Swiss-Prot record:
A motif (RDXXRA motif of the pArg binding pocket involved in allosteric regulation) lies at residues 338-343. Catalyzes the specific phosphorylation of arginine residues in a large number of proteins. Is part of the bacterial stress response system. Protein arginine phosphorylation has a physiologically important role and is involved in the regulation of many critical cellular processes, such as protein homeostasis, motility, competence, and stringent and stress responses, by regulating gene expression and protein activity. It catalyses: L-arginyl-[protein] + ATP = N(omega)-phospho-L-arginyl-[protein] + ADP + H(+). Its EC number is 2.7.14.1. GO terms for molecular function: ATP binding; creatine kinase activity; protein kinase activity. One of its GO terms (cellular component) is extracellular space. Transmembrane segments: none annotated. It comes from the Bacteria. This is Protein-arginine kinase. GO terms for biological process: phosphocreatine biosynthetic process. Belongs to the ATP:guanido phosphotransferase family. Keywords: Allosteric enzyme, ATP-binding, Kinase, Nucleotide-binding, Transferase. Residues 24-255 form the Phosphagen kinase C-terminal domain.
Length: 362
């Protein structure tokens, strides 16, 4: 497979499209946890019940068309290769738990990959909407519309006092998790992030790494989400999160301005050194690649680097993960082989940008 063909089929819309404040906010996600009456929760149900739930969603929703997102395809975890499941995790379309610990798990995936509905994860279903930039309100609107569409066909486990019933008590109520992924290199470089994260936690929000709980903030990418689901409306939860995110955006922009004023030539040097590493390396580990990509993205946003899309960070942070590298290679790779393949893929992607720039100048 040629790189361009691989790239065009691998990239989801949230990676390649721009959204509001997408210089700092990479994506917005809304996730709704729901369970169906007359079935035990996934934490205690048996294999027969698990299969019945998958069959119910396969018969009712697979290949159905939904406006703006296209048709849904059902992917059964038992029918996917380990690399295929890993790619879905790396694209943020399913959770590691569904990929690794749910033999009767499945996922309904929309054509544009903005919508994924996980089946038999921690709850019977988890509806996820993933949009580029800061679009929490828009993602919530689509998630609620999908939620209503599904509820026309199934009965949810719901309590008048508590709200939606979920396997984990922390999700009871709205059953909603709202989150954003943010690129905050200037707050990291100025070390302001060390005081900001505890302050955010005190507001009932959680700050995690790129792939959620327990993951590292590779490439200065942080995931910020709500913790409280009970006693607040979905709209209030989203507005509270948006308010904090908008403050973070302002602080990151101020920190960038400070860096440009005080360390302009050193910052420019850092950006171009990182670009040189990405453009010329023959071997590169994931952590170094993530840091260099973060530097280059910052350089693009500050105008140091021209004619390269800022979405290159979104794309390459995903495409250089182990699952994608092995899918591109067409087989399992040892860690040292992945480092070679990662360097080659990054060089190819940068060459694509150079060709686009040259064609644009003609």
């Amino acid at each position: 497979m040629s790189f361009e063909k691989f790239f065009n089929t691998a990239v989801s819309s949230w990676m390649s499209q721009e959204g509001p404040d997408s210089d700092i906010v990479l994506s917005s996600r809304i996730r709704l946890a729901r369970n169906i009456v007359d079935f035990q929760f996934p934490t205690v149900f048996n294999n027969e019940e698990a299969q019945q739930i998958v069959s119910l969603f396969e018969q009712t929703f697979a290949h159905r068309f939904y406006p703006s997102v296209g048709r849904f395809e059902l992917l059964k975890m038992s029918e996917l290769q380990p690399i295929e499941k890993r790619v879905l995790v790396e694209k943020h379309l399913i959770s590691p738990h569904l990929a690794e610990d749910s033999p009767f798990g499945a996922c309904l995936l929309s054509e544009n990959e903005e919508i994924s509905i996980m089946i038999n994860e921690e709850d019977h279903i988890r509806i996820q909407c993933l949009f580029p930039g800061l679009q929490l309100t828009e993602a919530l609107k689509v998630a609620n519309e999908l939620d209503d569409w599904i509820e026309e066909h199934v009965n949810y486990a719901f309590d008048e006092k508590l709200g939606y019933l979920t396997s984990c008590p922390t999700n009871v109520g709205t059953g909603m998790r709202a989150s954003v992924m943010m690129h905050l290199p200037a707050l990291v470089l100025t070390q302001q992030i060390n005081r900001i994260i505890p302050a955010i936690n005190q507001l009932g929000l959680v700050v995690r790494g790129t792939y959620g709980e327990g993951s590292e903030a590779l490439g200065n990418i942080f995931q910020i989400s709500n913790q409280i689901t009970l006693g607040k409306s979905e709209e209030d939860i989203v507005e509270d999160l948006k308010s904090v995110v908008q403050q973070l955006i302002a602080q990151e922009r101020m920190a960038r301005e400070t860096l440009v004023k005080t360390l302009n030539i050193q910052l420019e040097d850092r950006v171009f050194r990182s670009y040189g590493i990405l453009a010329n390396s023959r071997v590169i580990e994931s952590k170094e690649a993530a840091q260099c990509l973060s530097d280059v993205r910052l350089g693009i946003d500050l105008g140091y680097i021209k004619n390269i899309s800022r979405n290159i960070l979104n794309e390459l942070m995903i495409l250089t993960q182990p699952g994608f590298l092995q899918q591109y290679a067409g087989g399992v790779l040892r860690p040292e082989e992945r480092d070679v393949r990662r360097a080659a893929l990054i060089r190819e992607r940068l060459k694509m940008e150079e060709r686009k720039a040259m064609e644009g100048d003609e």
